[in-house]
Amino acid sequence: MAQFDIYESITNKILEQLAQGVIPWQRPWHGGLEGAKSYVTGKPYSLLNQLLLGREGYYLTWKQITDLGGRVKKGCKSNIVVFYKMTKTTETKMVDGEIKEEEKLIPVLRYYTVFHEEDCEGISPKGNKDEKPVSPLTPVEEAEKVVEGYYGREACKLNVELSNRAFYSPSEDSVTVPAMEQYDIVEEYYSTLFHETTHSTGHSSRLNRDMTGHFGSDSYSKEELVAELGAAFLVQKCGMDSAKAFKNSVAYIQSWSKKFKEDKKLIVSAASKAEKAVKFILTGERPTPVK
């Protein structure tokens, strides 16, 4: 029996959605990082797990369901949720002509399974009981709040001008996007701005991602996916309709499907980096380095 490959399983799930014309990182619900939550803790799952679960609401493990006196409805299937477990490993190095062993911690991807609360019987449904109050701000006001907060805090320069180009320049540490009036709808303006803003978090003074890739290279594709994910979740975080914010063609879907088939770890890596980027944009939080 073939050994279970978590990366392959994750990639296949994403590919299945793309084959149906669904872009997993562009969800119809509002709230971005908070669509799917743990029933027990109330905390939202990670960005990657949001993509895998694909359905907002509360989730429980089999044990949590039985501990609450409930059961899973007949025919309902579980969903994979992944997490990183820090594992000790020994690394051999040559130091001053001597072979030395050094212990280090590395993150290893693990998984467990959960069920949506609506697929359970005998437990009290949470529904929308724990939802946060609706923001008094409009989606555009929420988006402007994000933009002003980030560019007011960071040294990155924002250029909004009449042009036909949108790009981030690492050498100048500046984001350039066409003026809002050049877009058919305001959601497209903010999805473009958030895409380039996510790129800017990769600067060496911020999250220090590899920004050296040229168009068509693997490193370029990886960074593009980080920006796509970051933009999609920021748009949703602000309460905008992601279906309006992004123009997706068959070629777009086929392009990403091809990339995922070539690299089964691509979506896992990009989602992790995008989540760090989104948190940095919203809060300035930097990930704690692994020792």
Give, region by region, the residue ranges found by the protein language model:
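N-terminal accessory/interface modules of nucleic-acid-binding and processing proteins
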Residues: 1-291
